[in-house]
Amino acid sequence: ATGTLQNKDDVLNSTKKRRLKKAKKSSKPIFIVTPDEAYDNELEKSSDYKTWSFKADNVRDFAWASSRKFIWDAAGFKQDSIENPLVMAMSFYPNEGEPLWSKYSTEAVMHTMAVYSKYSFDYPYPTAQSVNGPVGGMEYPMITFNGPRTELEDDGSRTYSRSEKEFLIGVVIHEIGHIYFPMIVNSDERQWTWMDEGLNTFLQYLAEQEWDINFRSDRGEPRWITDYM
């Protein structure tokens, strides 16, 4: 959700709290809810109710997601910022997204913050999240929804192509980038499109090429502007 969880003692068991504490000090994603645990949760419906409390400062919108199918991984992203030196990068996704999501989603979240902060400004929020949702991609303060999943094969395994891998990495970069523009700068994306999609697409291209020089970016190459000239 948008914000920082305020009542973890009420909603997380000791195992999840221990894993989350470990993730804060890890530069690589750590499972807070494992794939096996998510599968077990999917089979067992709960009749209990829990209230999750979040607090957010300096936001203009709010979003949240909830599913017993969610795998949850997290890592601590360190940045050279006195005001906000540590950001919790997190991803939430079902087993239908594996093995793609656990390999690349949270890594792409952290990569985006590293590149965007280098070329623009430090990420000011305490969390940055990527959620596998029913959309191609959509952003809100601190949380994004991204669509790609893997293909189910006849033998029950799940696979993904290079295109699907690059789609996930690209959409995560793009939507996390939108937390910078327009969410943080608070511009009107309908009136000032160049301050939203324009700046974001430019930085997305830089981030994709820094991820992999052979990344097949579908936007951002300067020579493509000739189509509009």
Regions found by a protein language model. Give the residues of each.
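Zinc-dependent metallopeptidase catalytic helix centered on the HExxH motif
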Residues: 110, 114, 160-228
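Hydrophobic helix-coil surface modules that form long, contiguous segments used
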Residues: 1-173, 202
